[in-house]
Amino acid sequence: YIKNSFELRFPDEDDVGADYGFLDMNGDPNKGLKRVIDFTDKSSDEDFIAHFEEYFNKQYTLRYFLLVMGLGMVDNLGKNMMLDTWDGQIFYPRFYDMDTICSFNNSGVITFDTDIEMEQGYWNTSSSRLWTRVRDLFHDELVVIYKDMRQNGFDYDTLMQYFYDDQIAKIPESYYNKDFDVKYGPYATEYMGIANGSAYEHLKRWLKRRLLFTDTLYDYAPSYADSLTIRANTTEPMTIEIE
């Protein structure tokens, strides 16, 4: 089943043989993809939690998952995901491409709203054995990591800078018009749905709402004020506990 479902990209199969990296690496049963898949599929919940770091880089994998959730990257838990390893034992998920991000499907059509979840079946591999177990068994750790991400760069302003200021804004509007004339205008009835221009206003709305929704999944309550006012209707001594 592994040979039919996975493709070795590097090193080239012509150089190392078709089984390298799939069943085991150079005959070593303690390395390779089959070892990881068997662990993911067959381990008990207790063993999955206890031994996860013997198979995956945990911090990296959980952050990858949260990034995919936060940006609605519906193909990046399977079809558009690769697995990297440097020693044959510890694996890292990696983006293959990111064309399904911030509401778009892989044809460039605005498809997904801001409140999508895996449980609803929107992700290409919504029932993935790996990712459903990561989601359910590491939820408390995901909450902690998500808070760290949100407070250190994974925020609306920073994402808009990367997406829009550093990239989209550098493309003149006239280029979108010329692109339309060549690619979409002659085939308007078929491709009009993906002639979105810069999609600037849509991106602003979608990204802001998606982050707020994902915050609810991981118990994050952002504060947008630098001060807090509390009114107490009593003259008695009070104690306030802030977590």
Locate each region found by the language model:
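Conserved ATP-binding subdomain of kinase catalytic cores across diverse folds
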Residues: Y1-D15
